[in-house]
Amino acid sequence: MNVEIIGQKFEQATRLLCEYMPLAETLIKPTLFHCIRVGVYLYHHNYSLDLIIAGIMHDALEDTDISEGLLEKEFGLNVLRIVKANSVDETITDFWENKRELISRCIKNGEDSMIVKACDIFDSFNYYSKLKSQKDLDFCIGISKIIFNKLPENFSDEIFKTLKNKLSEYS
């Protein structure tokens, strides 16, 4: 993929996210910063344009007023599919059951959806370790364990090894 096109789409996604992102104090973490870091990680590790954009937009349906229709119009059905797989089902009220269902949905959607989720959790691990927030690190540990309990053997992308190594630092 042409670097110029990636740059244009990256900026388009970032601008859209900025336009719809609520004020930082209404969110549990600096979500915009997190979403950009996930996209940058995917870019620096030579993932496809759709994965880079899905990484930037992975929290858009949960944390902004961006609609599925707008996401599809701007970035296509594949990006929407990955973002939807990475979005919590608000009808499931049990916290950990919600996370197990989300991971199962990502797996069912395919390795690309799990790559974005693994990158999301890897970034959260790094962020919360810098904050020394044990509660948030415990969340990262818990969801990583769910990932590795469910991850199919044929999902072999490097991000899974990277996340497993990060998990081993805390287990």
Specify the residue positions occupied by each region the protein language model found:
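Active-site helical microenvironments for divalent-metal-assisted chemistry
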Residues: 1-171
